[in-house]
Amino acid sequence: MLKKGQVTIFIILAIIIVAAILVYFLWVRPTYNFQEGGQLNFEGCVEDVIKESVEKLGMQGGFANPEFYYDYKTNSVAYLCYTNLYYRPCIRQVAFLSQKFEAELKKDTGAKIQSCYESSVRELRSKGFDVKDAEGNLEIDLSLGKINVLFSAPTSVSSDSGGSSFEDFDFSINSKIYRLLSIASSIVESEIHSGDGGIEILRLTYYDLNLEIERQEGGSKIYSIEDETTKE
């Protein structure tokens, strides 16, 4: 079983990334604030949705539903670099891994986060609040140390004692995924130019990580990346 924070890369006459990068969630910070009793509390739901999706995307090479993939156990793992010729470098299949992961994360979580929002609206209405809600627009940005989630949905909440209105829900979730995806991209680049001979250079570069390679039958290779400090 893969450990938290670990990235595994498979090469089956190709390079397949199974980035089992479990989000290192420390906190979620909503930027909205209502009077006591009138809050839209769905940050926990958003956290769960993002975490679940990151785990799934990680195990499928960064794709929610990959079309060009390798079946590994119960996962369909997308090829990120591929060749069907021995002794020839593989050809990169995904130009910008972090951006692709970001887009797939947005696509995979959009409807679920909308559902989180609607569930919170229903809860407020059940408590007697008058709520005007809207279809939300989701933006997700991966940055160093964070997953930034912006859910825009013009909403107003009112009761006999007053009301509030707002446009955006802004969440910031601590995560190592951006850095791990960047390192995975470096491994892909190394395979293209140097094969697995570049692993020693990468070990020196990322000295705080434990980088291992395991060769499989049929030309397969498994790379693993583990944080030396946290052992995740």
Predicted regions and their residues:
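Glycine-centered recognition micro-motifs in short, flexible terminal segments and loops
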Residues: 1-12
